[in-house]
Amino acid sequence: MKSEINIFALATAPFNSALHIIRFSGPDVYEILNKITNKKITRKGMQIQRTWIVDENNKRIDDVLLFKFVSPNSYTGEDLIEISCHGNMLIVNEICALLLKKGGVYAKPGEFTQRSFLNGKMSLQQASAVNKLILSPNLLVKDIVLNNLAGEMDQQLEQIAQQVNQLVMQMEVNIDYPEYLDEQVELSTLNNKVKLIIEKLKRIIENSKQLKKLHDPFKIAIIGETNVGKSSLLNALLNQDKAIVSNIKGSTRDVVEGDFNLNGYLIKILDTAGIRKHKSGLEKAGIKKSFESIKQANLVIYLLDATHPKKDLELISFFKKNKKDFFVFYNKKDLITNKFENSISAKQKDIKELVDLLTKYINEFYKKIDQKIYLIENWQQILIEKIKEQLEQFLKQQKKYLFFDVLVTHLREAQQDILKLLGKDVGFDLVNEIFNNFCLGK
C-alpha cells in the first residue's frame, strides 16, 4: 500500500535536549524538503547530508543532518528522512511549521509503524511488539517482546496455520470426492491432530496470561510492629521522604506505596500499618490492609527492632500459610553494640545488605520464568481463545452428528481467525485500533 500523504512527527521526547529527530515519510519528501533547504536534496548519493533549513525569506532556521532512507529500504517502506536538528523545541516547532506549510501532514500515533505493516515490512505480530518494547516495564518483558519482534511468534502461528489448513483440505477431499477411497481419512486421525493443536494453543494462552502478570511490578510488603522503622526503610529504598516518619506508635494508618527500579526491574514497596499483638491475637492497626498487603506481595520484609528483637511466631506462621517468602531484618543497628546478621539502619540509610539480598532474590525470581512464546496484546489473546474454542467445538459436535460438511465449518472458522492473527485477513478497524495506542513518531 503506497500512501499519497507525506507524514512527519517528532520522534524524540518533546522538551529541550541535546538534539531532536523529526521523522518524515512519504512519496514527496525530497520535493518538500527542497523547498526549505539551501542545498539540493536528492535520493541518490550520500545517506547522510548536512544542510540548512531555511524559510521563504531564506532566513536560517537550523543547521541539520538529514538521514536518508530510500524506498523500499526504510522503516515504512517509503522514502523516509530523519531530520536531526538542535534540541531546542523552538527550532522543532519552526521546522514542523515549514513542513506543514509545504505539504506535510502531522502523523497519527503509530502511523509510521502502521505503514511499515501495510507495506509488508513487518508482520502484525512484529508491529504490535514495537509498541510493547517501548512500554516494557522490566528487562524480562523486554526480552520476551524482542522474541516476537524477531518473528518467533509468527513462526509458531504459521505452523498452526499449516496444520489447520491440512485438516481442512483432508476433510474437503472426503466431502467432494467420496469415490476416491485411497484419499479418505479417518475421523479419529483428524481428532488426534486437532487435540495436538489444542494443546499447543493452551500453552500459548497460559504463557500469555503469565505475561500480563509480568507487566505488574514486583511487590514487596514491609511488615512489623509499630515504630520499628518501616516508613524509614521505605524512604531509604526510594531515596525520598514518601512516608511520614515519627516516634509516635502507629503513625502509618494506611498502606503507603512507592516504586523504584532495581537492576532493571520495577519494584513496588508497600509500607504497612504496624501490627500489634493483643490478647485477642493479631490486631491490624490499619484494619485488614496490612494482611491484604502480605497476600498481594511477591516477597515480605519482616522488620524487627534490633534494640528489643522478638519474632512473632504467629505472624511467621501467617507468612508460611500464605506461601510467602520472607526476609527477617533487624533495624536500628546503629543503636546496639552486638550486631545481628541481616541488620540495617534505615534512618542512616545503611541498607546495602538488604538491597544486595533483594537484588539476588529478584534476579532468581525472574530467571525462573521461561522466555517462551507469548501473545502480547489483548486482541491477540481473544483471537487465539476463539481458535481454540472452534477446534474444541469440532470435537464436541461429533456427539451430535458426523457429517464432514458440518464439522469442517469449525475448522474453517479457526482458519480465518488464524489469518487475522497473522495480519493476513484483518479489517482496517482493528488495524487502526492497534496503532492508535502507539506513541507519536513511531
Curated annotation (Swiss-Prot):
Binds 1 potassium ion per subunit. It is found in: Cytoplasm. It is an enzyme of class 3 (hydrolase). Its EC number is 3.6.-.-. Residues 217-363 form the TrmE-type G domain. GTP binds at residues 227-232, 246-252, 271-274. Keywords: Cytoplasm, GTP-binding, Hydrolase, Magnesium, Metal-binding, Nucleotide-binding, Potassium, tRNA processing. Mg(2+) binds at S231, T252. (6S)-5-formyl-5,6,7,8-tetrahydrofolate binds at R23, E82, K121, K442. Pfam families: MMR_HSR1, MnmE_helical, TrmE_N. GO terms for biological process: tRNA methylation; tRNA wobble uridine modification. One of its GO terms (molecular function) is metal ion binding. Its main location: cytoplasm. GO terms for cellular component: cytoplasm; cytosol. Its cofactor is K(+). K(+) binds at N227, S246, I248, S251. Belongs to the TRAFAC class TrmE-Era-EngA-EngB-Septin-like GTPase superfamily. TrmE GTPase family. Homodimer. Heterotetramer of two MnmE and two MnmG subunits. Exhibits a very high intrinsic GTPase hydrolysis rate. Involved in the addition of a carboxymethylaminomethyl (cmnm) group at the wobble position (U34) of certain tRNAs, forming tRNA-cmnm(5)s(2)U34. This is tRNA modification GTPase MnmE. It comes from Mycoplasma genitalium (strain ATCC 33530 / DSM 19775 / NCTC 10195 / G37) (Mycoplasmoides genitalium).
